[in-house]
């Protein structure tokens, strides 16, 4: 029987007084622990010689295990690439006029890592990075990994209450940020919850509300109570501190925690998904392999990244994947800007582009879109939320992204677990989120019976493998709720799987509408409404109803300049979808309630609609 690779034994994570993980994370390679009743596991030979397919008519699939998982730390991966292609351009930050080769980037990262240790930070300490995309963000991402410090990805839009919550939750010892960006005054926001910073000695902060926070680092301006990032890097430039860094690295393990990614909070308070070097290195490596980066020339390895670095897609699929494959990471702007993204593609001869559906819509809708030279584009990734089929086709045909990959994942899974192959058809890319990634298992469970769902039958998607997080920082109970005894992570997403192993996300289990006993999945209806020529965007929610339990409400945003009526929309539905799926309520809206990271909060939309409809 084949050996199962990549099973993580979850330790309980707790942020006690020592601030370290409450239990060591071990790697289990036992088939006995991977038992799945009623399913015969594929041997490694069977898995490796074919595209991974479901087994026995049931919604279970195991990814290819032909290539070994990588046991290097992030720092070791940077060292390897810097030695292999030292003169190749590694990082371009257009809005800061920064250009670094891999050799130069490694040198700066080593100095920054050494500097962080020199000011008193230690392995396992948490450092929050709070700000938009910048050179400092990439530097801190790599320097913390090099030093064994855990990077906490802090949403740059956080206000005082949100900032206090995440810093307390993980016990941040250090916080790095710019003075301001647009109207976001970072230092002033911090002072609302930490007024002591104004009179503190740099590196010696003592805060009543943030007792763990001792060090505040300003990226770009001298501020009271803070260290300048340039000073920290300079402090790490001495031979003594660089030698100390090198000595410390022998105690780093690929299974050490490296990053805390906060979930977006669409259903409650954010949780800190904790990821290891092992999670991040292997996920980025496998995504690059799925994109076939190993087959590209250096000229074709130029990635435009408008996605935020505080998201997993940006930090893992962007920074880390470029590092693994010697690709050039190009940051077009501090926050997403469709025009700047197009300018970066044209000016920097970009070949790959990452983004969410909203970003791609904005890029395609730029008034001067046709004036940009996008001839060098060949592929990229769309992820973050469901994308309607017509958008997929527009990206492939209009942005020249023939090798577009639709990817699916969650922060808890490092993040990508399903993605297309570049050669998959437009129809396959438009109708699914692709096939299982290597060294990953997926199953879809019947939510009522608790058994494996048959193919093409909706159920909750569960994931197992190397990619599953270490846990939610400081929340062992929520970790146990999310990851069961057999190490299956419950995504909360409702999905189907077909005979070829393609996965389609139907909706969120919490968003499922039960109308008179019928299960209705909002994503299915949203896909349908996107075929209406006047509809720009639509969100479907369930609203309370005394007789049916729930009724369907479609919240439709029309394209600019378009007009229609409720009656016309309902007439469009007749004969095309089942009568019980036709929304009882249709409301035309101009926007949706969003999290600060831009995700639609359906529970708030539901509340708004129930008030609007006087239910």
UniProtKB/Swiss-Prot annotation:
The modification N6-succinyllysine is found at residues 182, 478, 544, 570, 599. ATP binds at residues 263-271, 493, 508, 599. GO terms for biological process: fatty acid metabolic process. The modification N6-acetyllysine is found at residues 179, 182, 340, 398, 510, 544, 570. The keyword Lipid metabolism applies. One of its GO terms (cellular component) is mitochondrion. Residues 1-41 form a transit peptide. It is an enzyme of class 6 (ligase). It catalyses: a medium-chain fatty acid + ATP + CoA = a medium-chain fatty acyl-CoA + AMP + diphosphate; octanoate + ATP + CoA = octanoyl-CoA + AMP + diphosphate. CDD domains: FACL_like_2. One of its GO terms (molecular function) is medium-chain fatty acid-CoA ligase activity. It comes from the Eukaryota. Its EC number is 6.2.1.2. It is found in: Mitochondrion. Keywords: Acetylation, ATP-binding, Fatty acid metabolism, Ligase, Lipid metabolism, Mitochondrion, Nucleotide-binding, Transit peptide. Pfam families: AMP-binding (PF00501), AMP-binding_C (PF13193). The keyword Transferase does not apply. SUPFAM superfamilies: Acetyl-CoA synthetase-like. Acyl-CoA synthases catalyze the initial reaction in fatty acid metabolism, by forming a thioester with CoA. Has some preference toward medium-chain substrates. Plays a role in adipocyte differentiation. Belongs to the ATP-dependent AMP-binding enzyme family. PANTHER family: ACYL-COA SYNTHETASE (PTHR43201), MEDIUM-CHAIN ACYL-COA LIGASE ACSF2, MITOCHONDRIAL (PTHR43201:SF5). This is Medium-chain acyl-CoA ligase ACSF2, mitochondrial. It comes from Pongo abelii (Sumatran orangutan). The gene is ACSF2.
């Amino acid at each position: 029987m084949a050996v199962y690779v990549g099973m993580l034994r979850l330790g309980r994570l707790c942020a006690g007084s020592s601030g370290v993980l409450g239990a060591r994370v071990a790697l289990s390679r036992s088939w006995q622990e991977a038992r799945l009743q009623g399913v015969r596991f594929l041997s490694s030979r069977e898995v490796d010689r074919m595209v991974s397919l479901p087994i026995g008519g049931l919604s279970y699939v195991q990814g290819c295990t032909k290539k070994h998982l990588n046991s290097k730390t992030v720092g070791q991966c940077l060292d390897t690439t810097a030695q292999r292609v030292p003169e190749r351009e590694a990082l371009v930050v257009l809005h800061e006029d920064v250009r670094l080769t891999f050799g130069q980037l490694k040198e700066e990262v080593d100095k920054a890592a050494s500097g962080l240790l020199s000011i008193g930070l230690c392995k396992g300490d948490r450092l929050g990075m709070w700000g938009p995309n910048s050179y400092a963000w990439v530097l801190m991402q790599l320097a913390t990994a090099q030093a064994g410090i855990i990077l906490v990805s802090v949403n740059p839009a956080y206000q005082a209450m949100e900032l206090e919550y995440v810093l307390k939750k993980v016990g941040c010892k250090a916080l790095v940020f710019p003075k301001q960006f647009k109207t976001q005054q970072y230092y002033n926001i911090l002072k609302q919850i930490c007024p002591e910073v104004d009179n503190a000695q740099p590196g010696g902060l003592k805060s009543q509300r943030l007792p763990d926070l001792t060090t505040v680092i300003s990226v770009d301006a001298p501020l009271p109570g803070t260290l300048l990032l340039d000073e920290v890097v300079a402090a790490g430039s001495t031979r003594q501190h660089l030698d100390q860094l090198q000595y410390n690295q022998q105690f780093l393990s690929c299974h050490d925690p490296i990053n805390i990614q906060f979930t977006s909070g669409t259903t409650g308070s954010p949780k800190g998904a904790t990821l290891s070097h092992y999670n991040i290195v292997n996920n980025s490596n496998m995504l690059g392999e799925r994109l076939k980066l190993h087959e590209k020339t250096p000229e074709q390895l130029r990635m435009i990244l408008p996605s935020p670095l505080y998201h997993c897609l940006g930090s893992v699929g962007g920074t880390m994947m470029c590092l693994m494959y010697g690709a050039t990471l190009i940051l077009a702007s501090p926050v997403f800007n469709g025009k700047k993204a197009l300018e970066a593609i044209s000016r920097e001869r970009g070949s790959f582009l990452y983004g969410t559906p909203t970003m791609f819509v904005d890029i395609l809708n730029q008034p001067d879109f046709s004036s940009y030279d996008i001839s060098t584009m060949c592929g990229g990734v769309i992820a973050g939320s469901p994308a309607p089929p017509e958008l997929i086709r527009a990206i492939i045909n209009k942005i020249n992204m023939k090798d577009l990959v639709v990817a699916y994942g969650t922060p808890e899974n490092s993040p990508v677990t399903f993605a297309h192959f570049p050669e998959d058809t437009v129809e396959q890319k438009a109708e699914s989120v692709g096939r299982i990634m290597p060294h990953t298992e997926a199953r879809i469970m019947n939510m009522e019976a608790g058994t494996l769902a048959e193919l093409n039958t909706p159920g909750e998607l569960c994931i197992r493998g190397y990619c599953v997080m270490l846990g939610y920082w400081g929340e062992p109970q929520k970790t146990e709720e999310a990851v069961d005894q057999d190490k299956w992570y419950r995504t909360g997403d409702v999905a189907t799987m077909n005979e070829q192993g393609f996965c389609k996300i139907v909706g969120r289990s919490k968003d499922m509408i039960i109308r008179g006993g019928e299960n209705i999945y909002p994503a299915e209806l949203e896909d349908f409404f996107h075929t209406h020529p006047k509809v720009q965007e639509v969100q479907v929610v369930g609203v309370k109803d005394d007789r049916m339990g729930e009724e369907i409400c479609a919240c439709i945003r029309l394209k600019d300049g378009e007009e229609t009526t409720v009656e016309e929309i309902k007439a469009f539905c007749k004969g095309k979808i089942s009568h019980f799926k036709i929304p009882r309520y249709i409301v035309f809206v101009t926007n949706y309630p969003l999290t600060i990271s831009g995700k639609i909060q359906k529970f708030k939309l539901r509340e708004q609609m129930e008030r609007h409809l006087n239910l």
